[in-house]
């Protein structure tokens, strides 16, 4: 190897090491922020939302107490009771070499939350019953399930927006 090749390899390794360190630091900071948020709001209902363009009871995130979780979900602290959740949900599934990407329009649904509990809301390709069977009951309690069906090309696609109360 000549010196130019060695210099390029060294430069790439240095850039990779710096980027890796920065990303590791950001991940640790986000994890610490999430844990602090959860601790500060343990007396509220914590809703982990895996969607975009979120509104709760007609209010945008700017008017709500929220943080970003380690999986880039939005965690919102809410009082117990009935709430209306709005958002654009997305999910992806890989079947062999084929990838299905599904995105909803703005969806709205009502959910009743209890203070002191944690919940997650996301879109899945399988119903709560199918997921519970597949994961041998190792999923939370489904408190809301909104079945969706789409016609994408010649494929018939079904999906579900499910809100789970976490174990």
Q: What kind of feature is each model-predicted range?
A:
Residues 1-77, 88-167:
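Short loop/turn and low-complexity linker motifs enriched in small/turn-promoting residues
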Residues 81-86:
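A short tyrosine-centered beta-strand micro-motif
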